[in-house]
Amino acid sequence: MAAKEVKFGDSARKKMLTGVNVLADAVKATLGPKGRNVIIEKSFGAPTITKDGVSVAKEIELEDRFENMGAQLVKDVASRANDDAGDGTTTATVLAQAIVNEGYKAVAAGMNPMDLKRGIDKATIAIVAELKNLSKPCADTKAIAQVGTISANSDSSIGDIIAEAMEKVGKEGVITVEEGTGLENELSVVEGMQFDRGYLSPYFVNKPETMVAELDSPLILLVDKKISNIREMLPVLEAVAKAGRPLLIVSEDVEGEALATLVVNNMRGIVKVAAVKAPGFGDRRKAMLQDIAVLTGGTVISEEIGLSLESATLENLGSAKRVTISKENTIIVDGAGVEQDIQARITQIRAQVAETSSDYDREKLQERLAKLSGGVAVIKVGAGSEVEMKEKKARVEDALHATRAAVEEGVVPGGGVALIRALEALTNLTGDNADQNVGIAVLRRAVEAPLRQIAANSGDEPSVVVNEVKNGKGNYGYNAATGVYGDMIEMGILDPTKVTRSALQAAASIGGLILTTEAAIADKPKAEGAGGGGMPDMGGMGGMGGMM
């Protein structure tokens, strides 16, 4: 085991504080409408230019191991805020830096770190409760566009396109962000449930000009196994032919004799039919088949529940208004499922989203959720160069997270004003002892930090701006983009309550941990030249001279 170096008390905290400040100073340069860019060198290709706090934080690794511990803890603040609300990483970093710096002074002056932390925690709870009181619901398109604009560093085109996407697919719908091919941002919307499986044979195509198979008012057969024997399917095919409606088959696979028979029937016009593979693999495929069943009002034919394909009847089949199948995708529009069943399925998937700890599983569950709740919107980001494209795509994703957070928990006045107004909650708050009161005072000063930084990045005097905002009431604040004081909501400067809350809670949590650290342990740096020596000189290899 490698030897360790241990630092205690003030010398440990001082080193960590240096690391906190290095990381936070790099991140906070990006805060606000006049925040600057940070340029990051890459091991290959062009450098990345970004105004995204978490992207900057992730790149920082310090040489001194004790300083690096402090930096990594603040990086964790940015990541926590990002995981919880998808935005607010820079605000969280600025708050954490302020809490650590203010708290460090108090610890150095002889205050008890544990009582300080309790005071900070008490004040955080009070401010979070006050933020909830200040919060206003965010329901209309205009407010959603404003939130998106602010999060995308005051780019109104991004705010508008996100608001339009939310209007079209609903608050729960899936909105994905992709790299576009032009200079302008584009929005395309797919109605209904789409999954990434195309037709199993091009002979199912009935629209040769677009190479798609389109079925109007089809019946939908869902089978949780491979179909290779046509005899199993004959009863269902005969019933569908009598009903005179098209048929879509979604199964693990259709192959051999079964596929050939379906193609022949389709080409002769006996039964208008198309077959696709079920989406996903393993247990996820079973779950997605069940989703399609709920959406279309059908039953999955599965031997696990005692249903065989031979005994399937028209009652087991789902239906939809229209199905469009291309080479790679299938879209089911307006399924005939019962609304109550669909809502129950959505509630069940939401519970699974809340329980899962895997990011990949969460993403897949949210995709299923959106497919059930109607519609997928794709925002294609346009830009003039690849470097700009990456930077812009990151901003669009941030803005999308912020708008979702705003819809979920409402909005508060932006620009650091909500935190200043929430200070009223601390007016009569007292701790159990003098040191806890100092902890409350630490947070009281720290929550001014985002507004101070926004003002500083705009070239204004932070103390003057903070005093002016404190003397105002309600939504009165400072628009750093124009240098004007006024009603923040009317000026369209809004922050999602969830983003502000998550930023404060993450910052207070990590800030308290750093202040209560009494010992820090790191690997001892290896002495130069301590590695293994080179291989000894092996001399020439004899007997090789005659070889050319």
Curated annotation (Swiss-Prot):
Binding site for ATP: 30-33, 51, 87-91, 415, 479-481, 495
A molecular-function term among this protein's GO annotations: isomerase activity
Cellular localization per UniProt: Cytoplasm
Pfam family, one: Cpn60_TCP1
Signal in keyword set: no
UniProt-listed GO biological process terms: protein refolding
Chemical reaction(s) catalysed: ATP + H2O + a folded polypeptide = ADP + phosphate + an unfolded polypeptide
CDD domains on file: GroEL
EC number: 5.6.1.7
Keyword Chaperone: yes
GO cellular component terms listed in the entry, alphabetical order: cytoplasm
Keywords (A to Z) from UniProt: ATP-binding, Chaperone, Cytoplasm, Isomerase, Nucleotide-binding, Stress response
Record-linked SUPFAM superfamilies: GroEL apical domain-like, GroEL equatorial domain-like, GroEL-intermediate domain like
InterPro entries from the UniProt entry: Chaperonin_Cpn60_CS, Cpn60/GroEL, Cpn60/GroEL/TCP-1, GroEL-like_apical_dom_sf, GROEL-like_equatorial_sf, TCP-1-like_intermed_sf
Subunit structure: Forms a cylinder of 14 subunits composed of two heptameric rings stacked back-to-back. Interacts with the co-chaperonin GroES.
Family: Belongs to the chaperonin (HSP60) family.
Protein function: Together with its co-chaperonin GroES, plays an essential role in assisting protein folding. The GroEL-GroES system forms a nano-cage that allows encapsulation of the non-native substrate proteins and provides a physical environment optimized to promote and accelerate protein folding.
HAMAP family registered for this protein in UniProt: CH60
Name this protein carries in UniProt: Chaperonin GroEL
Organism: Pseudomonas fluorescens (strain SBW25)
This protein's encoding gene: groEL
